[in-house]
Amino acid sequence: MAREENVYMAKLAEQAERYEEMVSFMEKVSTSLGTSEELTVEERNLLSVAYKNVIGARRASWRIISSIEQKEESRGNEDHVKCIQEYRSKIESELSNICDGILKLLDSCLIPSASAGDSKVFYLKMKGDYHRYLAEFKTGAERKEAAESTLSAYKAAQDIANAELAPTHPIRLGLALNFSVFYYEILNSPDRACNLAKQAFDEAIAELDTLGEESYKDSTLIMQLLRDNLTLWTSDMQDDGADEIKETKTDNEQQ
């Protein structure tokens, strides 16, 4: 199947909300690239949307099951807890496979072939995101390894973003948003999370008048999410996370 046809099929799968198939079509596009070829902005966004939906459904399932597990444990329902743990393991296996799939794709072809600054940041941010999703449910040495890989990818992305992308660039802002969520949720460092989010927000505000019309909506939306998280984190550091922490859903369509 030609590249254009796979892209069209991916769009069709998105409309039908068949995201596993959308992933498959975009993987075919990604692996068929020549050594000097890159995904277009549209193609990389389609890949991101596909994986975000596939992983998002499992992340939501895992959170619900984990919450039920805690309740059953507190009630002393050991039989129920055993059933829940087995079911949670099944979801975790799916999460691992999805993350492994995109991380292999990023390391084998997408990151090495990226030439423009925004492409490099986009893919390194994506690498950080999927290691972070692993860190959300892994434990012990595996969690530590996932967290270290997340930090390494986000820092590499941040270095390029600070050097090559404007403070108002939606990809740079999206990176700051997700990096700050990593500090808060995975490393339990609310101070670092707040500092990173505030710096990104302040730097973008200072250059808001230079923002082009095409990315104005995306950039201001992520800035709002940064501010929402800052408000949440600073108002009550003791909050148990009852309110939803905001992170980027896709890079061209913040939700």
From Swiss-Prot:
Cellular component terms per the entry's GO annotation:
cytoplasm
Q: Which SMART domains match?
A: 14_3_3
Q: Name one GO biological process term.
A: protein localization
Report the Pfam families cross-referenced here: 14-3-3
Q: Which InterPro entries match?
A: 14-3-3 (IPR000308), 14-3-3_CS (IPR023409), 14-3-3_dom_sf (IPR036815), 14-3-3_domain (IPR023410)
Q: Which Gene3D superfamilies match?
A: 14-3-3 domain (1.20.190.20)
| Source domain of life | Eukaryota
Query: According to its UniProt record, which protein family does this protein belong to?
Result: Belongs to the 14-3-3 family.
Q: What is this protein called?
A: 14-3-3-like protein B
In its UniProt entry, the species of origin is given as Nicotiana tabacum (Common tobacco)
